[in-house]
């Protein structure tokens, strides 16, 4: 049993929680299901460390991510979007104590994701006024600059892992393609089956807003196209587009932002499969795909 989990169990009694059970684990957080004082199921999101690092992102501020999750969930719930209700945010006073977010636990019936319904939900999300916050993933700069800089950073990181890796795309070319990018919408940027709770295939909650940015729908679609290459994400991009088009215009494939956002996503996935969750088949193939996208630009 880890020291942080032992500390969590101690705190759980103080918060009136019982029956902690691990239900998910990622790079920065573990998620437990528990029962609250009122008998309702609760999701307990626990940061592994105060600051974390991985191949894609250095010095991840997990406290800032928990605060962002809390604020975004409350903002979207107030606008009628299906999210896991954020109940309480506990920020530790001591380094030994974990930061924890308590949310409503939203079950999934295992029926699979209806991509058409997901498209309709994403159109609703992108029309909601964005929350008054600076997303953690923006690193305190504009979305266009954040994407340009992380493409360069991740490209260089892959170059230390892959032989004969070429020079990166010119940063001015990337910035030029993002010149028209607005920040009028909240985009999730991690939409896949693991982060969508469903009932009879229909999305009933969007989870995990760690990657969120303020941007335009083209950012979301660039990420969706790349995620859809992996069947476990359960994404049918054409069905998503059809559902989205019921209430909002779908970004065209000719949108210059979309090609950049595809490259941004492809580089992230290449690093995932090269070193975060190493896969001897997917890693090199993902790096080759990212290189091809860059050459098209």
Identify the residue ranges that each predicted region occupies.
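An alpha-helical support segment within catalytic cores of ATP-dependent transferases
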Residues: 3-18, 114, 128-189, 288-294
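Protein kinase glycine-rich loop
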Residues: 21-25
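ATP-binding pocket architecture of kinase catalytic cores
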Residues: 27-140
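Active-site acidic catalytic loop and adjacent metal/ATP-binding pocket
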Residues: 29-35, 43-44, 173-219
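A general structural signal marking secondary-structure boundaries and capping sites
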Residues: 80, 90, 126-133, 178, ...
């Amino acid at each position: 049993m880890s020291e942080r989990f032992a500390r969590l169990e101690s705190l759980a009694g103080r918060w009136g929680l019982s029956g902690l059970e691990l239900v998910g684990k990622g790079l920065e957080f573990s998620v437990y299901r528990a029962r609250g004082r009122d008998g309702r199921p609760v999701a307990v999101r626990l940061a592994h460390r105060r600051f974390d690092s991985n191949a894609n992102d250095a010095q991840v501020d997990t406290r800032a991510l928990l605060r962002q999750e809390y604020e975004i969930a409350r903002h979207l719930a107030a606008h009628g979007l299906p999210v896991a209700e954020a109940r309480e945010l506990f920020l530790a006073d001591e380094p030994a104590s974990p930061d924890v977010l308590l949310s409503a636990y939203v079950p999934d019936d295992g029926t699979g994701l209806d991509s058409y319904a997901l498209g309709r939900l994403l159109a609703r999300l992108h029309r909601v006024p964005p929350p008054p916050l600076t997303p953690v993933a923006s690193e305190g700069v504009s979305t266009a600059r954040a994407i340009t800089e992380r493409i360069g950073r991740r490209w260089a990181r892959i170059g230390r892992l892959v032989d004969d890796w070429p020079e990166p795309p010119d940063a001015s070319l990337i910035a030029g393609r993002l010149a028209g990018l607005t920040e009028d919408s909240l985009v999730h940027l991690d939409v896949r089956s693991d982060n969508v709770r469903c009932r009879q295939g229909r999305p009933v909650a969007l989870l995990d807003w760690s990657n969120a940015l303020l941007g335009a729908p083209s950012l979301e679609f660039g990420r969706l196209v790349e995620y859809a290459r992996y069947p476990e994400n359960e994404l049918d991009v054409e069905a998503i587009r059809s559902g989205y088009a019921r209430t909002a215009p779908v970004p065209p494939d000719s949108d210059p932002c979309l090609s950049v956002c595809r490259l941004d996503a492809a580089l992230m996935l290449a690093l995932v499969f090269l070193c975060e969750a190493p896969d001897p088949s997917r890693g090199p193939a993902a790096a080759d795909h990212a290189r091809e996208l860059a050459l098209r630009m």
